[in-house]
């Protein structure tokens, strides 16, 4: 179970970082 939970947490963190980076690039391009 801990492995699945840690994997899910890692996936969620990666998704958050990717979306944040994408939004940052979009804002930079917008400006």
Swiss-Prot record:
Transmembrane annotation, as ranges: 4-26
SUPFAM superfamilies, A to Z: PetL subunit of the cytochrome b6f complex
UniProt superkingdom: Eukaryota
Membrane protein topology class: Single-pass membrane protein
Keywords: Chloroplast, Electron transport, Membrane, Photosynthesis, Plastid, Thylakoid, Transmembrane, Transmembrane helix, Transport
GO cellular component, one term: chloroplast thylakoid membrane
One Gene Ontology term from the biological process aspect of the record: photosynthesis
InterPro entries according to UniProt: Cyt_b6/f_cplx_su6
Subcellular location: Plastid, Chloroplast thylakoid membrane
An example molecular function term from Gene Ontology annotations: electron transporter, transferring electrons within cytochrome b6/f complex of photosystem II activity
Record flagged with keyword Plastid: yes
Function: Component of the cytochrome b6-f complex, which mediates electron transfer between photosystem II (PSII) and photosystem I (PSI), cyclic electron flow around PSI, and state transitions. PetL is important for photoautotrophic growth as well as for electron transfer efficiency and stability of the cytochrome b6-f complex.
Similarity section: Belongs to the PetL family.
Assembly and interaction partners: The 4 large subunits of the cytochrome b6-f complex are cytochrome b6, subunit IV (17 kDa polypeptide, PetD), cytochrome f and the Rieske protein, while the 4 small subunits are PetG, PetL, PetM and PetN. The complex functions as a dimer.
Protein name: Cytochrome b6-f complex subunit 6
Gene that encodes it: petL
